[in-house]
Amino acid sequence: MRVCVIGGKLQGVEATYLAHKAGWEVLLVDKNPSPPAKGLCDLFYQVDVTGEKEFLPICRETQLLIPALENQKALDALHHLAQKHALPLAYDPLAYGISSSKLRSDKLFMDLALPVPLPWPKGKFPLIVKPSGSSGSDGVRRMNSPEELESFRLSQGTFDGWVIQEFLKGPSFSLEVLGSPEGYQTLQVTDLEMDASYDCKRVLAPTALGESEIKRFEEIALTISKGLDLRGIMDVEVILHEGQLKLLEIDARLPSQTPTAVYLSTGINMVELLGELYSKPSNPAVSCPPSPRGVVYEHLKASPGKLEISGEHIMANAGPLRLWENFFGADEAITNYEPHRAEWVATLIITAESRKKAWKRRCGVIEQIRTSCSMSAYLDPSPANSPSHQKS
């Protein structure tokens, strides 16, 4: 099968990696000349998808279009083109339109009576302030006092377009749902760990959540899917605060990071399932194995004398990445590493029979990198008041 991935940033890296694991050929399209996924694809086209004349011939060479971008103008152009020419596009514009706005998605959560952080002013300090239209940790700020919040308001001129909620302490978790109104399937829960700026630095599988919490998480995800009439895939993120799961955000698109961890832990390939969903009349059948493998998936930044674990933002501007096998003992790495480079970044992918064994392997990989590259300093920052693995 030949697929076209539109967008070569981190979602594009994810889609390309998993498409290759499915045995597919990947044509990558991006308007920028050197996106991260360029080093992973089979063919690259520097094309602006809003220009139909250039883009349509590429579409006709493929059996599936996978959007891996958040530019609304480009997404609208893709949807229009797919409707006009009957092209298979893995995109649900209505669900994405809600999930791409934190204000609209929070309203949906409240309409569905789902547990969410208290909005300000009901929620007390400290608060989290985040832009409605950005995904993940982009633009997220913590406010510890009324004075900080007022200073922020003055700098912005308004609170319009911002979500302001109580700051909750606790571990974060992710779960994907896939399907259509005919039926939905939850996949595997993964555990998320953040850097100091609340950007996800590490994904762990299988989850440390108990069975009752997993079941509750699945119920929440299925309720949202039905509320959206989702057709496609959606990522749901929650935080476990004082024994209760609270919804943080949703994204009705192929996410980055967690799909690879789920694939390596369970063998479930979300990109392959998307292909089945958009090319066959019935929903794909999915079953999780009884004994998933342990996975550690994390990002690191190397500089002279120092190795630092960091959020995925470090990968976005690293230029074309490539896939290395047996990278300092890791199963795989997606990286711009070269032996002569003093500064480089990598996403480490490490598996074992269990999560505990995968973590032990990961610590050995970190030590091997530090020894081989003469790095005496090691940092693994986390948000204040959050647990973290500080030592390898």
Which role does the model predict for each range below?
Residues 1-91, 354, 360-381, 390-391:
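ATP-binding N-terminal substructure of ATP-dependent carboxylate-amine bond-forming enzymes
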Residues 37-40, 55-57, 97-104, 197-199, ...:
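Short, charged, surface-exposed secondary-structure boundary motifs
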Residues 63-64, 189, 342:
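Structural motif
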Residues 96-171, 180-186, 202-223, 362, ...:
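Active-site nucleotide/adenylate-binding loops and adjacent lid/helix of ATP-dependent enzymes
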Residues 166-229, 240, 251-278, 290, ...:
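ATP-dependent carboxylate/phosphate-activation module, predominantly the ATP-grasp catalytic core
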Residues 230-242, 380-382:
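A short glycine-rich, hydrophobically flanked beta-strand micro-motif that places a catalytic Asp/Glu
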Residues 244-246:
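Conserved protein kinase catalytic/activation segment
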Residues 275-392:
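Peripheral (often C-terminal) accessory segments that flank ATP-dependent C-N-forming ligase machineries
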